[in-house]
Every structure is written in C-alpha cells, then in structure tokens.
Amino acid sequence: MTSLPLGVKVEDSAFGKPAGGGAGQAPSAAAATAATMGADEEGAKPKVSPSLLPFSVEALMADHRKPGAKESALAASEGAQAAGGSAQPLGVRPGSLCAPDAPSSPRPLGHFSVGGLLKLPEDGLIKAESPEKPERTPWMQSPRFSPPPARRLSPPACTLRKHKTNRKPRTPFTTAQLLALERKFRQKQYLSIAERAEFSSSLSLTETQVKIWFQNRRAKAKRLQEAELEKLKMAAKPMLPPAAFGLSFPLGGPAAVAAAAGASLYGASGPFQRAALPVAPVGLYTAHVGYSMYHLT
C-alpha cells in the first residue's frame, strides 16, 4: 500500500531533480516499462499497408508515376466483384455513394427504357421502316391506350324544293312568238276572251300559255314602274345639309347677334363691371331657329 504512493512521489521528484544516485534508478525503470508497454500496443495493432489506402500519399504518387496502375486496380476490383469476393478497399463502405476509383457496374441499356419498364421486347418499340405494314404493340392496340377511330360523318344531303308531280314543263317560246307577245302587250295589257283565243291561235299557242305570259308581263311592268318612281323621288328630294353646316341664330335675327356682340365688347367700361350678355325671355322659344339655304317644297 505504501509502495504506490512512494513510486508516484519518486516520479514527481525525478522530474524536478537531476538523475543520479539510487533515486534516479527508479524513474529509469518506470520509463523503460512504459516504453515496453507502448511497443507491445503498437505490435498488437494491425499494420495497414500504405498501398491499400486510396487517398494516401503513396497511392496518389503511384498513380502519377504509373499510368497503368489505376486501370489495373480497376480491373482487379471488377474481377473481385464478378467473382463474388468480399474484399473492398479501406475507407469505402458498401453503401457509400462516393466510391473512389471503383465505379458502379454499368447497368444494361434497356434497364430504365420503356421496354424494360413495360416488359416488352425491344423489337416492338422500333418503328417499322416500311410504311406499308405498320406494326403496333399489344398495349397500343388496347382500347385503353389507343383512342377510338374517328367516325366519318357523311355530308348532309342537299334538300331541294320538291315540285308538284303534275307540273307542266316550261314552255320554250320562240323569238317570233316573244316579239309578237311584247308588241301585243304594248298595245293592250288586258285581253278579252275572244282576243286571247284569236291571238293564241295565230301564234300556235294555247289560251292558258298566253294568259300566263300576260300575267307575268304585267307583274314585271309593275316592278319596273315602282323602281322608276323611287328613282324619281330620290332625284327630286333635296339634300338637306347637316346641322353643323347650317347657320343658327337666336330669336331676333342677325341684328340681335350684332347687338349682343357690341354690348359684350363695349359694355365693360369699369374695371369691376361684367360684360352684359343677352338674356332670352323665359317661357318663349328656347330653341334657336336655323336658317338654311335650301327651301322645302
């Protein structure tokens, strides 16, 4: 129990005193024992070869010195992974994202492609070169993915006016018949039964044909007459100018306008007097009378 504190005291005293005599032998023995224990601990630790560390100075210098060293290391690591070896370089974890000098094995090209996701053959995704035989994959032929075919709407049939079944065809009049009918119409627009029968027989026409022609000709003459009357009315009607071009005067005529203008100019004799303005009588004509150059008939 007394030797441990003595040893501690001896070490404390050994640092403060020069080595010598019997007191200096105890510190030297303790130092030798500590050195031996440190050497044993270092021997117990596994020695790591510098070449195994990927980021060590020796590994970096070796990569610069030997260009083919990196390729050989990559080939060796790929061979170890292919053989199922579990040996991995230090400092690189199996699930780490940044693995130096050990790129992940390339996946097949079609792993994330449409064919890989839909589990379809690659031939079905390639467009056929010949447009004559278009090939469609099963999922495109499914009604779920492909739209329904567009319906071709037939153009609506043109509806024509239906004529009567017992309608007689239009009579083609000759030029001589038309001239004779026009001459007879100018002489007399209405024919009696006897005149119509005689005139139709002279033209080799039926009485009904002559009757219908005279009816149509009277309707045409009426339309022409109405159009002519409308033209005459438009020509005889005077063109009234708009209100902006008409001269507008108040009640009293131009003389009242001149008097009002003179009163407004010369009525203000004093500095505080306001110009006198003409005031129209209340209750009488409040609208101005417009004098126009045109006279209505």
Curated annotation (Swiss-Prot):
MF terms in GO: DNA-binding transcription factor activity, RNA polymerase II-specific; RNA polymerase II transcription regulatory region sequence-specific DNA binding; transcription cis-regulatory region binding
Xref: PROSITE patterns: HOMEOBOX_1, HOMEOBOX_2
GO annotation (BP), single: regulation of odontogenesis
Modification comment: Sumoylated by PIAS1, desumoylated by SENP1. Sumoylation of Lys-9 and Lys-127 not required for interaction with H1-5, transcriptional repression, inhibition of myoblast differentiation, or binding to gene promoters.
Coiled-coil parts of chain: none
Residues within the DNA-binding region(s): 166-225
Bias type Low complexity, positions: 25-38, 71-88
Keyword Transmembrane carried by entry: no
UniProt key word Transcription regulation: yes
Keywords linked to the UniProt accession: Developmental protein, DNA-binding, Homeobox, Isopeptide bond, Nucleus, Repressor, Transcription, Transcription regulation, Ubl conjugation
One term under GO cellular component: nuclear periphery
Compartments in which it is found: Nucleus
InterPro entries: HD, HD_metazoa, Homeobox_CS, Homeodomain-like_sf, Msh_Homeobox_Regulators
Region spans: Disordered: 1-50, 64-93, 129-157
Chain positions of cross-link Glycyl lysine isopeptide (Lys-Gly) (interchain with G-Cter in SUMO): K9, K127
Main location: nucleus
Assembly, per entry: Interacts with CREBBP/CBP, TBP and SP1; interaction with these transcription activators may inhibit autoinactivation. Interacts (via C-terminus) with PIAS1 (via N-terminus); the interaction is required for the localization of both proteins to the nuclear periphery and specific binding of MSX1 to the core enhancer region in target gene promoters. Interacts with H1-5.
Function: Acts as a transcriptional repressor. Capable of transcription autoinactivation. Binds to the consensus sequence 5'-C/GTAAT-3' in downstream activin regulatory elements (DARE) in the gene promoter, thereby repressing the transcription of CGA/alpha-GSU and GNRHR. Represses transcription of myoblast differentiation factors. Binds to core enhancer regions in target gene promoters of myoblast differentiation factors with binding specificity facilitated by interaction with PIAS1.
Family membership: Belongs to the Msh homeobox family.
Protein name: Homeobox protein MSX-1
